[in-house]
Amino acid sequence: MLRTVFNKPSVLKSGVNSITKQCRSLHANAYLLNKGNSNGAEGQDDDVTVRIRIPPIKRTGESLDKKRARLIYQSRKRGILETDLLLSRFAAKYLKEMTPEQLEEYDQLLNELDWDIYYWATENYSITPLPDRWKNSNILKQLQEFSKNKDREILSMPDLSKY
């Protein structure tokens, strides 16, 4: 069956044409998104051209136990190893003791981009500047202190029993 499809030049040609059209369309859309995003220097574009912000899900009536369980999961499953290790260890140490207000603040922090959280926690503001909304955050200050790893512990994902 496959042999007959690929032996017909018209079928193969139409498939290639379809892929070519899709690639051109994607390239055109990328050009339109990037257009006008220069950083002030003529002919130079930002390294990050588009940031799409997806609003977080509004959770109403969530119990504290459910919120803690969700925050544990979100701290452990970020997608970037560095942030996973940092946030999962932080959650294992502090999440049980957090007040409802602190849990809400931590929840809002987890809605930020992974690399932003990592650079803010490690106080590397030259790469990702700290927004005003986080400058007075007690949770972020606690995370920054925690990220210094003053005890020089070997970082590994904490066991779920630690939460």
UniProtKB/Swiss-Prot annotation:
<dbReference type="Pfam" id="PF03937">
    <property type="entry name" value="Sdh5"/>
</dbReference>
<comment type="similarity">
    <text>Belongs to the SDHAF2 family.</text>
</comment>
<keyword id="KW-0143">Chaperone</keyword>
<dbReference type="InterPro" id="IPR036714">
    <property type="entry name" value="SDH_sf"/>
</dbReference>
<dbReference type="GO" id="GO:0006121">
    <property type="term" value="P:mitochondrial electron transport, succinate to ubiquinone"/>
</dbReference>
<dbReference type="GO" id="GO:0018293">
    <property type="term" value="P:protein-FAD linkage"/>
</dbReference>
<dbReference type="GO" id="GO:0006099">
    <property type="term" value="P:tricarboxylic acid cycle"/>
</dbReference>
<comment type="function">
    <text>Plays an essential role in the assembly of succinate dehydrogenase (SDH), an enzyme complex (also referred to as respiratory complex II) that is a component of both the tricarboxylic acid (TCA) cycle and the mitochondrial electron transport chain, and which couples the oxidation of succinate to fumarate with the reduction of ubiquinone (coenzyme Q) to ubiquinol. Required for flavinylation (covalent attachment of FAD) of the flavoprotein subunit of the SDH catalytic dimer.</text>
</comment>
<dbReference type="GO" id="GO:0005759">
    <property type="term" value="C:mitochondrial matrix"/>
</dbReference>
<dbReference type="GO" id="GO:0034553">
    <property type="term" value="P:mitochondrial respiratory chain complex II assembly"/>
</dbReference>
<dbReference type="InterPro" id="IPR005631">
    <property type="entry name" value="SDH"/>
</dbReference>
<keyword id="KW-0496">Mitochondrion</keyword>
<protein>
    <recommendedName>
        <fullName>Succinate dehydrogenase assembly factor 2, mitochondrial</fullName>
    </recommendedName>
</protein>
<comment type="subunit">
    <text>Interacts with the flavoprotein subunit within the SDH catalytic dimer.</text>
</comment>
<dbReference type="InterPro" id="IPR028882">
    <property type="entry name" value="SDHAF2"/>
</dbReference>
